[in-house]
Amino acid sequence: MAGNEERSKGTFATGDATVGEIMEEAYSCRFDANLGEVTRLLVERGVSSLPVVDGERRVVGFISDGDIMRAIAAHKTRSVFNGGEATMLYFDDEPLDRKARELKHRNVMELATRKVVCATPEQPIGRVAGLLSKKRFKKLPVIDGDGRLIGVVRRTSIMRHVFALLFGE
């Protein structure tokens, strides 16, 4: 996994903060990684999603465990006519392990979201908290002025900041 794993550094501070002050280290995968490598990274790092970066660390996608699970759980469908009315029947005779093995060698960009919402270090965390809440995201990649990944901001990062503000810890 060493060739397809990227890591950037982040910091954490309390007070009236911007994203840059509370962002955390980001794990990412390269755009040319396969889903087997991505799944391994998700499990080994204990994360549920990863920004996908190009060779210059620009964010080009975002992949989550949910994207992979949807692909594994996808059902094949066929239409059947019953008395003149179309009825959709679901069938899936392919075992789960076979589906997972078939996904293993597919490119991450086949499942990754390509329109990625990102934060910048200068943004106030209140604005990003609102965005995370509204979009129901768990985290956002943090990018520099050139679109390169420099960290992530998570809901838990914001909650730690709020806790520190409330309790002075």
Predicted regions and their residues:
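Tandem CBS (Cystathionine beta-synthase) repeat/Bateman regulatory domains
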Residues: 1-169
